[in-house]
């Protein structure tokens, strides 16, 4: 952290909460009054709107080589976060001009899981589904949820599994399972498992 910079920007040296989840990154400054534009990792940015404290870590080098504004983890108080013209934008306490906002470009955003609003019945945050094992009704393991993607009316589970190529070598493959009631029987977050009506050869 460069001397004198942290207080002027409202940055506070911190450490990530034990339940921290990476939810996006700062794309760029937005406007001239210290607002920033956010790239969320999920199509549902509700957690960004409810959390009053965000945690930032240095950008991936490919997004922002030579970043030196801070090192480690810092926290910021959020004055406001909202959607404007289809983009998520936010204003932090202590960041009041475009130069200050541009200085954060590329920073990775983390939130405490405890700050997420409660999901409705039969609704789940993507971050809670990633990493769950997927089994079908017969108990056959179909793989592990690597990611999800939005396809208009519903989400799709990207399930990664081990496979064997024609030459006998091991490889990793992926199957797509629509995350809809017609195929998903049960989601057990505590048990880290999703049961689906799906066959390995689909």
Curated annotation (Swiss-Prot):
Annotated Gene Ontology cellular component terms: cytoplasm; ribosome
Alphabetical UniProt keywords: Chaperone, Cytoplasm, Ribosome biogenesis, rRNA processing
Major location category of this protein: cytoplasm
PANTHER family in the cross-refs: RIBOSOME MATURATION FACTOR RIMM
Domains as described in the record: The PRC barrel domain binds ribosomal protein uS19.
Quaternary organization: Binds ribosomal protein uS19.
Protein name: Ribosome maturation factor RimM
Annotated source species: Polaromonas naphthalenivorans (strain CJ2)
Lineage: Bacteria, Pseudomonadati, Pseudomonadota, Betaproteobacteria, Burkholderiales
Annotated gene: rimM
